[in-house]
Amino acid sequence: MSKRALISVSDKEGIVEFAKKIQELGWEIISTGGTKAVLDQEEIPNIAIDEVTGFPEMMDGRVKTLHPLIHGALLGRRDLDSHMKSMAEHHISPIDLVVVNLYPFKETLLAGGSQAEMIEKIDIGGPSMLRSAAKNHAAVTVVCDPMDYEKVEKELSADGETSLELRQQLAAKVFRHTASYDALIAQYLTEEFPVEDTKPEKLTLTYDLKQGMRYGENPQQSADFYESGLPTTYSIAQSHQLHGKELSYNNVRDADAALQIARDFDEPTVVALKHMNPCGIGTAKNIEQAWDYAYEADPVSIFGGIIVLNREVTEETAQKMSKIFLEIIIAPSYSKEALEILSKKKNIRLLTVDFSKKEQSEKEALVTGVLGGLLVQNQDVIVENPKEWTVATKVQPTDRQMEAMKFAWKAVKFVKSNGIIVTNDHQTLGVGPGQTNRVGSVKIALEATADKDALLQENAVLGSDAFFPFADNIDEIAKAGIKAIVQPGGSVRDQEVIEACDKYGIAMVFTGLRHFRH
């Protein structure tokens, strides 16, 4: 008796060639609905599944493969006499090869399918057949990915059957595939049918391998890059690389951080970043001037940095950027001349990202791994209204200082805590990131500012991501000549800090919102 294969696919890629090959090898093919129509058109002999079950497809195809004559043929163990006896008693012939892929749930969702359309794209029979076949992989070969047709065909042609090793690998792949498929459905339905004030008791996330990496944060660490099952358009995961080597683990982390900073600015802006901290941010009326500001902010740290521009890279801007070593440049687009200039640098990575979708990226939850678990939170993307800020001091900030405070407050949100930043209204001047005490971060930011041209320091302000716990911070700020501060407020010693500002003639604004970043 010839061996039997069951083929039921939504993705018809490569199926005709595969079916022809196994038919030539003597396999009998059972098929369903649309798959049968394709095979019939190519004149490949096949049997309709209802001829096997004796039961017609019904309910618009919702019920067609959920039948004992199918699942018994998949699940029956060939090494157990009791199973083989049951199969004989019920006239069940074994099925040794299952080729199934699932209804395009993800594709329909990304295309904006209605709720009714999404429900119809929840595959029931397909996952059931895949799981049954995968469970019985000791005897059954199961294929859920057209990319695996060739390796199955190769073994069948050579040996008449597949190896246990291949069947085991394909079975594991099936359970990854169906788990991912169900995770997307669970995610969709959880969002569609929320329970008020209730957290889902299970968190189901699915990611697809985007890139295997040479190593992780350090050479002794292995790493891979996975993309969310529902892609975020404005993201490093969805970027398009035009030139250069593959991204490293650290490249991806830094590029992601830089994209998050750039997302907050609508005017022409350039962000320069190193080790997850901004080292230069500049805004201007045009992108070339914005580059000048970002570069001048810290011409030392920018070396080997990650650059994000929120406008097309022009020839003039490219000429300037090409004069220093940069790891990555990300922009919406590049002029022809700019691309030619930058592509001459062998080691630079040039990428594009769709900036028109940046607001949509704000909806994605942030997931952080810890030993034994995950932390999940919304992004820190609350829209703030500076008109609601409170002037806490006797001295009122000038209009120019208020504009600088708005800029500083956007920028300091992305500095690692304890985070301090000194800016004017269009440019960062000094960054003090990641110290375990706030006065340490203040000193670093002020030291970086001290070597700037006096003209750049005019109307400079200082921003702090969280409140000042002690007035000693104000003493340091006053020594540097800073005359305006923006911070959340909220310390039990706020009054001491306010009095220190009044003593030094410093204007200070409370925003009421903290922006820790760890």
Swiss-Prot record:
GO terms for biological process: 'de novo' IMP biosynthetic process. Pathway: Purine metabolism; IMP biosynthesis via de novo pathway; 5-formamido-1-(5-phospho-D-ribosyl)imidazole-4-carboxamide from 5-amino-1-(5-phospho-D-ribosyl)imidazole-4-carboxamide (10-formyl THF route): step 1/1; Purine metabolism; IMP biosynthesis via de novo pathway; IMP from 5-formamido-1-(5-phospho-D-ribosyl)imidazole-4-carboxamide: step 1/1. Residues 1-144 form the MGS-like domain. Its EC number is 2.1.2.3, 3.5.4.10. Pfam families: AICARFT_IMPCHas, MGS. PROSITE patterns: MGS. Keywords: Hydrolase, Multifunctional enzyme, Purine biosynthesis, Transferase. It catalyses: (6R)-10-formyltetrahydrofolate + 5-amino-1-(5-phospho-beta-D-ribosyl)imidazole-4-carboxamide = 5-formamido-1-(5-phospho-D-ribosyl)imidazole-4-carboxamide + (6S)-5,6,7,8-tetrahydrofolate; IMP + H2O = 5-formamido-1-(5-phospho-D-ribosyl)imidazole-4-carboxamide. The keyword Hydrolase applies. GO terms for cellular component: cytosol. InterPro entries: AICAR_Tfase_dup_dom_sf, Cytidine_deaminase-like, MGS-like_dom, MGS-like_dom_sf, PurH-like. The keyword Hydrolase applies. GO terms for molecular function: IMP cyclohydrolase activity; phosphoribosylaminoimidazolecarboxamide formyltransferase activity. Belongs to the PurH family. The IMP cyclohydrolase activity resides in the N-terminal region. HAMAP family: PurH. This is Bifunctional purine biosynthesis protein PurH.
